């Protein structure tokens, strides 16, 4: 298995500086562009309304795990309510800032993948930050309930990197499985990608790894039957 190049050494400081500068630039542009036009939408109010209203009666597990438009969005629920607890609901700016930080993570994952497939580090550093703006500054770039799609995808890419591309250690299996479970917890739509990892292992006859890869899917199945 090819090893990821080290991109934090002295020889790559310029590339890293370019990457983080562009991420900061795009994030700032999005905040400036939408700071007066963003607001909470029906998905947010559903979380703040019915879930919080039933918290005392139905318990914390129902609060986190109850379906939202037929999906598990426990991570989104904790994200919304946690920020509201600290900042209130007068301004959407704290949500926009956290979305920019999360999209930095998405860009970083793509940055690493680009280097892995052989793209020049400087070219990757220039291209990857464009995942911050997602085409013509669409709502996925600043609205949390849509941003979770790309954030979950990034966790699934981390899952694939550790679980499929590096099966040489138990640590890699644990990291890959944990990333998948976290991605599904944030938004369950990414559960559809888990069978891809399992299929790769079955083709390679790596039965133990295929079993480990199935754990997030099994956990999702239990949630689906329970809630």
PLM regions: where:
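Membrane-interface transmembrane helices that cradle and orient dolichyl/undecaprenyl
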Residues: 151, 156-174
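Perimembrane helix-loop-helix junctions
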Residues: 5, 192-222
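Membrane-proximal lumenal/periplasmic loop motifs of glycosylation machinery
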Residues: 35-40, 55-81, 85-96
